[in-house]
Amino acid sequence: MPVPGDDMGETPLTRTPIPMPAYFSQAEQSFSLKKRGRSLCYTLPPRPPVKSALPVSRIFPNKQRSWSQPRPQSVSFRSPQNKTPASKLYDQSKGDTFFKQCFKSICKLGRGSFGEVYKVQSLEDGCFYAVKRSVSPFRGESDRQRKLQEVRKHERVGEHPNCLRFVRAWEEKRMLYLQTELCAGSLQQHSEEFAGSLPPRRVWNITCDLLHGLKHLHDRNLLHLDIKPANVFISFSGVCKLGDFGLMVELDGTEGSGEAQEGDPRYMAPELLDGIFSKAADVFSLGMSLLEVACNMELPKGGDGWQQLRQGHLPTEFTSDLPPDFLKVLSAMLEPDYRRRATVDWLLSLPAIRNAERWRMVTLAQERTLGKIIAVYQFIVWLLSFVFQWLNRPVIGFLHYCGLRALPRSPPCSPFPNHLGESSFSSDWDDESLGDDVFEVPPSPLATHRNLTYHGQELIGRHSPDLLSRPSLGSTSTPRNLSPEFSMRKRSALPLTPNVSRISQDSTGKSRSPSTSHSSSGFVDAEVQRTLFLPRNLLGMFDDATEQ
């Protein structure tokens, strides 16, 4: 309804300081024209897609990518792609992935922002490897190409004794897998095991190994840009290897220095802040890593300490115990000016490095020789044990056959073992057996027969009637029922002696009474109990001693 106005024809809403909405003039109209389709500016924007889901285009038709297929595909920049990884164990008809069918996961070694590393055992050759799997699936073609660059960098490095060996890579279900050799641990873990600094000889060995690995990269115009103890791996033979080439840059490639990224700020060269990427940056990072492990020093991430190290000032309280030759090497590697900083070739030409390299070669030769000797010794021991078992197989089989044919014999001192008497009774309890005659329990026919015969030996004897009337120590518990079928089967299986005949079923049937619970258990009269020979208990032995 229309809003009433005043004498001037103005409504109260016109005098309010609040601006009147644009649609208020249309509110007084009873009818309005039909609105046509509004423009895109009046519609709500579409909701953003989930980051973990595949990007779906709302304009172009959804194209199925080859890498989005669930089937595994080999990734290599040397050979044609879109091939299934070569393995005899993989079956495409199964629902499991290539990783689960061909590898046995042992444990998780670590996790980073780009992937997680697992220690696995190959089911094809039985060797142990390290497999790095990407944390998140491919979000698109650009994200996939960015992650596949790490595979190309590993193939670009090639094989070298001081670089982590790359085995193969594949993609499956929009996830990237990289298989490399397995090492014993990283240099950071190795240095943390020591209470203080590493020994000088060990530091020289690490320096020689890493300089040779860095020379291999620089000869191929490759920059690592992330050298630190966490990215240096130690093999099981003690050789240090450079790894984690995710930030590596090719100087003569298409990337150039525009796509380069600096690594950890604790080991970063000062010229990287100005965007200058050169081989000298890796030399500075290697010097900072050696300073940390040699002096057991916590490197600063920033502040005055970070500036002092970049200005060539080495703290004397940490470097006073270092050898002079090694301190000279560190000073040359940590030169603030990258143009005057030492190169890898110049460092390898130093007399101290050459001397340490000769000792390193002798040490590695000794370790390899010792490893081969141990392997040959283990093979000989295994071969001798196999031949010994093969020759003694007929003898072991004959002894096993004789052991099965031999009858068990019981010791003569205990003709009534407890396990023999307890095994013939059922473990069920009878509610009617809890009566007044608990201590006066007649023996069962099966127990009577076992007392008379035991493995073919005659056990009939005489004893005092008053001693037999006393309850034994084992008869003070509530009697348990005997299964009729089980007792008949046991009774028929017992051996007989010439002097003692089998108890007839007629005699046992006469002593049973259907009105009592003892009749169902197969108990006999008490007169039979007095004529049997029972094992002596402590109470009987005490009475015999008092009578004498």
UniProtKB/Swiss-Prot annotation:
GO cellular component: cytoplasm; endoplasmic reticulum membrane; Golgi membrane; nucleus
Reported function: Acts as a negative regulator of entry into mitosis (G2 to M transition) by phosphorylation of the CDK1 kinase specifically when CDK1 is complexed to cyclins. Mediates phosphorylation of CDK1 predominantly on 'Thr-14'. Also involved in Golgi fragmentation. May be involved in phosphorylation of CDK1 on 'Tyr-15' to a lesser degree, however tyrosine kinase activity is unclear and may be indirect.
Gene name in the database record: pkmyt1
Record motif Membrane-association motif, residues: 376-392
Single biological process term from Gene Ontology: meiotic cell cycle
Record has Endoplasmic reticulum as a keyword: yes
Organism domain of life: Eukaryota
Subunit: Interacts with CDC2-CCNB1 complex. Interacts with Mos during oocyte maturation.
Originating organism: Xenopus laevis (African clawed frog)
Protein name listed in UniProt: Membrane-associated tyrosine- and threonine-specific cdc2-inhibitory kinase
